[in-house]
Every structure is written in C-alpha cells, then in structure tokens.
C-alpha cells in the first residue's frame, strides 16, 4: 500500500492511504538508519502490514523538496502571513521568511491579514517593495473571510505551509479554511488521539484537494545555517543582473562597477530590499570572522 505521512511522533508514523480515509500507524524499517534517511511529514511512502496488523514503512519515494525548520517533505508553496498592525509589521522578519522560502525553492505568496485595521495607502512603500521583488500579495481579513476564497483556490493541488510571526491570524485562517465539514475528522482524530489541549506536533491536513501543513514551530526563524553564497541566490531581483558585474563572484557590496548597485540606483531594485541584503550579508561575514 502507498500513502502520505501526515504525522510522526515517538518513532511512530501515521500514513493516510491513497484514495481512502484510512490512517495506518507504522514504524520505519531499520534499514533507513543505515541510509541516514529519516521519514518526514509529507513523505510519500510504501508500507506493509504483517500478520499482527503492525505497519512498517518499506520505501520512501524521492522528495521534491525538504524543509528542516519545520521538518516537512514535498511542500510546494508557502503563505507568508503578516499584518501591518496588531502586531506591527517587522520588515526584516518578513524578508527573512522570504529568504527561507527562496532557499527551499518554495513559491512564496505574501498575505497581509487584518486589513480592516489599516489604510492600505499608508503602507504603499512596503507593498511596492514586495511587488517589485516579484511576489504575489493577497490582502485579507480572515475573521470576516475577506478574500479567503482566493486562499482556498491556491491550496488546491498543493502542499501548503503557513508561516509568519505570532499573532497575525494564521490560526484564524486555518480554522476558516479547514472547517468542520472539510476535515477528515473521526478517523484521524481517533488514530492520532489529538485532544483540544494536547501538545501539538506538525501534521498534514487534507482539505479541498490539497494538503495544509499545520505546524506550531514556524512563527520565528533563524537563518544562520545559510552561507553568504546562499544569500546571493535568495534575492530573486538580483537574478536579472547576474553576470553583468565587473568582477566574477561579486557580492554587490563594496565592489566597483556592480550591476546590482546600479540597478538599485536606477530604481529597478527596491532600496529597502537591497539594504536588507547588505545588512544580512554583513551579519554573515561578521559571524564567519568570529568563528576564526
């Protein structure tokens, strides 16, 4: 049988079988320890069931993508959720989430929630910065379900992770999207023993022909595992100017005749995105100096 790992806890993995609402509890075969391949939420797997009705993961199919913070496989897109007010927007944090999406080859869609609290015109420079970077933006008021129909359409045929700081309304969005009528409730709830006040672990939820990553650990992030060379490739606006700088390996920092810096001066790259890049690059370089 084949299916998708929707939850993993204490060495047990819960697999939703293809074309069924059946959830089977499995352990991973010992052979995976020798390959250093650990099953992850989102993995598409092949399982067997022995005569004692015990399940075992026999094969993990090739992953399209891997996230390690949180640990989820085969995610296709991220909804990066922020609000302008309550809490006030942190531009550097938003840019860090976008960096992480680029690093993991995820399509990022920026969702500004709680739009009933603000005048969009007051934040047009931030909006311009995100649009100029090439990201789609959706303006929401999740409590009143404003534009939630757009979100539901995006989820179809995708594995979607919600990310963003605490308090911006991610839980409200999830609740509006999932709804009691669309959750596979009884079977999953019984198998996973998920109570109202239990400790939460990452899991996948099937809804509207798509999968949602419901995770408690994607509200803040650390990008210190990245190298400065990674950073260069995680700012999509730079890509049109790669190879046009005077020096090979240009970091677009203090080097002369830099095509990226010229693009900033000419308004092709937003100055705030470039300033964020320089700030982050210098943090990475200072970190490396401290190691030595």
Swiss-Prot record:
Q: Which residues cross the membrane?
A: none
Look up the record and give one Gene Ontology term from the biological process aspect: translation
Q: Give me the comment on cofactor binding.
A: Binds 1 zinc ion per subunit.
Start and end residues of each CP-type G domain: 64-221
Give the enzyme class: hydrolase
Q: Which residues bind GTP?
A: 113-116, 164-172
Superkingdom, natural source: Bacteria
Needed cofactors, names only, are:
Zn(2+)
Q: Which UniProt keywords apply?
A: Cytoplasm, GTP-binding, Hydrolase, Metal-binding, Nucleotide-binding, Ribosome biogenesis, RNA-binding, rRNA-binding, Zinc
Principal cellular location given in the protein's record: cytoplasm
GO cellular component terms, A-Z:
cytoplasm
- GO molecular-function terms, A-Z: GTP binding; GTPase activity; metal ion binding; rRNA binding
What InterPro entries does the database record attribute to this sequence?
A: G_CP_dom (IPR030378), NA-bd_OB-fold (IPR012340), P-loop_NTPase (IPR027417), Ribosome_biogen_GTPase_RsgA (IPR004881), RsgA_GTPase_dom (IPR010914), RsgA_N (IPR031944)
Give the location in the cell. Answer: Cytoplasm
What is this enzyme's EC?
Answer: 3.6.1.-
Residues that bind Zn(2+), according to the entry?
245, 250, 252, 258
Query: Subunit comment for this entry?
Result: Monomer. Associates with 30S ribosomal subunit, binds 16S rRNA.
Q: Which family does it belong to?
A: Belongs to the TRAFAC class YlqF/YawG GTPase family. RsgA subfamily.
Q: What function is annotated for this protein? A: One of several proteins that assist in the late maturation steps of the functional core of the 30S ribosomal subunit. Helps release RbfA from mature subunits. May play a role in the assembly of ribosomal proteins into the subunit. Circularly permuted GTPase that catalyzes slow GTP hydrolysis, GTPase activity is stimulated by the 30S ribosomal subunit.
Q: What is this protein called?
A: Small ribosomal subunit biogenesis GTPase RsgA
Q: Could you tell me which species this protein originates from?
A: Clostridium botulinum (strain Hall / ATCC 3502 / NCTC 13319 / Type A)
